[in-house]
Amino acid sequence: MAGRWAAGKPRSIKALAPQPLGVYSAAMAFNEIRPSDDQPFGSFAPHGLVARIIGWTRRASDSFLGRKVAYALRRLGLNTLKGKPVDIEALGAQMRLYPEGNVCEKRVLFTPQYFDALERDLLAARIREGFSFIDIGANIGAYSLFVAARAGRGARILAIEPQPEIFARLTYNIAQNPFGTVKAIACALADKPGELTLFLDPANKGESSVRILRSSNANAVRVPATTLLALAESEGYERIDAVKLDVEGAEDLILEPFLRDAPESLWPGFIIIEDSRGRWASDLPALLESKGYAMIAQTRLNLVYERTTS
C-alpha cells in the first residue's frame, strides 16, 4: 500500500497514528479510493474539446455575460466528460477532480476564479510565517491546498473531512503536492465527542452534515466525532490563525462550545463560515460579536469574521 502511494508524493500527508476518535491517515483511506485514483496523476489530463472548454471557462470574466457564458460552457464540458475525472492544476495545487456529483469540484475545475474569490483574497492577505489554518468540512482540499501553496514550509494546516469517499479524494489531492504542511483527518466536528450520524446528499457528494439535509434522497453513515477544542489540544495548537467552516448548517454546533470552553489565546483571528443562519439553533453572529469578532464581508455563500479585540 505504501508503495502505491509513493507515486503520488506521500510526504505531503502527515500520517496519523490510530486513535479512538477514528482519525486516520491517507494510507488508511486507500480502501475508499475508486479504481481511477489508483492511476498516476496525469492519467486524466484534459485534452481535445475538454481542454479547450476548461481554458475558455477559466478565462471568463466576472461580468454577468462572462459568467453566463462560462456556466453554459461548463455544462457542455460536464456532458463531454461523462463522469470521468480530470487531473489539473487549480488554486496553486495539483488535483484530481470529479466534477460530476460534487459542486465544489465542478467549480474548482471549470471556474476557479469564481470559487469564493473574495474569501480567498481576504484569507491570503492574512497568511504569515508559521500560519495555522483549520479547514472544517475540507471537501477535496480546495481551501487547504490554496493555503498550503502560499503559506510556506512553516505552516500547519488541518483538513477535516468525515465523508469517506470525499476524504479519499482529499488525501489523494494532498499527495500530489510537495507542500508537506497539510494533515488530513477523517472525523466530524460537533458539540461533543462520540459517534454521529452523517447525512449525505447523493446529488452533491461534498454536501454532508450531522444535521438532516434538505435533500429528500439523503443517505446516512456513522462517523467518529470530536470537538474543535479537543482536536486543537490533541494536535498541540497554541494559536489558530484562521478557520473555515462549511458543514451544511452545523457550524454553530462546532463554534459555540469552542468559544465557551477554549482559552481566548486559542480563538482564531479570522473565520470563514458558510452562511446557514436559517438552520442554526443559536444566533451565531451575535455570539461572535459578543466575543470581539466583526463581520468584515458577506458573500452569497459565506460570512467572514475577524477578531478585533484580544
Residue ranges and their predicted role:
Residues 8, 12-310:
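Phosphate/nucleotide-binding beta-alpha loop and adjacent structural elements of enzyme active sites
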